[in-house]
Amino acid sequence: MRTVILTFDDAVISQYNNVAPLLKELGFGATFFICRFNDEWRAKNEQYLMTPDQLRQLDRDGFEIANHTWNHILLTEYSEDVIEQEIILMNKYLMDNGIPAPVSFAYPGGPFAKNAVNVLKRHNFLCARSVRNEAYHPEKDDCMNLPAFSICGNDPDFFRNAIAQADEENPVILVFHGVPEYVHPWVDLDMSLFREYMSILKDGNYRVCSLRDWFQK
């Protein structure tokens, strides 16, 4: 069965209100990558982030809750010590709120950060997702640099071309942000289009799962 892995970045509240109910209805799994951004950003925008209660509900519903750092910093520009602190802070936040220790990670902003790999391995992560528009080939791709397609805007052909690359052994990983996105309009996706995309996956008999589901299969 062809596999598509759904990932959602930045803990946007619309993922809880709009995305998760539809995924539950369709029987789809997904990974939600959580960050908190910096204090100044949160002071203005915290209402657009999921709360601990909402994260716990997603976890109870069987979705994967994963680490996207605390401040959403571009890791290539920081030392291992700073990276480790970012990862520890987010792990602690999740576990203090009743979420299991994360096993998946996503690089903020998308680019692979080689300087983060040793830190991720020390903290027992199974995989780390970057963003580059190609399918994941387990035989050749490093699990600490998973490729993924960023799905946003209004381009159904891009979505269809992305999922067409999936097969039983080589899943396609998709990255979404807000549906809709309230603060970062360049990664916005309309709910009607998201619903259309999920219908394509359902009608196409794709296996739709989280990163954790794939790596712990």
Which ranges hold each PLM region?
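Boundary/entry segment of secreted carbohydrate-active catalytic domains
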Residues: 2-14
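Metal-dependent polysaccharide deacetylase catalytic core of the NodB/CE4 family, i.e.
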Residues: 3, 24-126, 134-146, 169-181
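Glycan-processing catalytic domains of CAZymes
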Residues: 7, 67, 127-129, 133, ...
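Short beta->alpha connector loops
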Residues: 10-13, 108-112, 151-154
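Aromatic/hydrophobic pocket-lining residues that form the small-molecule binding cavity
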Residues: 15-16, 51, 83, 87, ...
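Histidine-anchored nucleotide/phosphate-binding helix
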Residues: 16-23
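Catalytic grooves of carbohydrate-active enzymes
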Residues: 151-213
